[in-house]
């Protein structure tokens, strides 16, 4: 008896329209910047919550993930890495600092600005509370980790080599990346072959 392989559950990703709806539902620049970083870098929520101002190199348009302890318990699950970002994200960061962050004395990028204790590092719970509010506003029952899956999927479909994607995600090996996103290679190969008419009008009939 031949056992059929059970298909692995594929990671959920956000369509561009869904991501735009989430960003547009953010009423504060801090919140919009938080999700913009998730979407642009493919970082984990804990890695973004642990960002410090020194980790954002505005001139180079880079965000660095540094493994270390943070007061809010946020941490990087993998080794350090640097992720290139676009100028739009850097401009949003500058707007956030100018319009909302102001003169708050903190090393952390994401802090309490309206809730007490003001200036303290934003917590996982605070971020989750925001997710709940955005779910209610948008009708999208999303998880922040979907931003990570979306970034990886976008990179791979745009032709970025899996070795590079693995490094950007901070995976321990390419094998880890392949185990999660390897289905994209087969899916995209099928799409290309179908577009080329490979499965129709064959000279040899089975």
Which residue stretches match the model-derived regions?
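Flexible interdomain linker/hinge and immediately adjacent N-terminus
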Residues: 1-21, 113-118
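C-terminal secondary-structure termini that scaffold catalytic or DNA-interacting sites
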Residues: 196-206
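A short, basic/aromatic helix-end/turn motif that makes direct DNA contacts
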Residues: 50-56, 166-172, 180-183
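Short, basic (Lys/Arg/His-rich) helix/loop patches that form interaction surfaces
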Residues: 128-167, 171-174, 194
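Conserved tyrosine-mediated DNA breakage-rejoining catalytic core shared by Y-recombinases
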Residues: 50-91
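Active-site/catalytic core of tyrosine-dependent DNA strand-transfer enzymes
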Residues: 86-140
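Basic, Lys/Arg- and aromatic-enriched nucleic-acid-binding interface segment
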Residues: 7, 16-45, 49, 104
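Short, charged phosphate-coordinating catalytic segments
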Residues: 38-61, 163
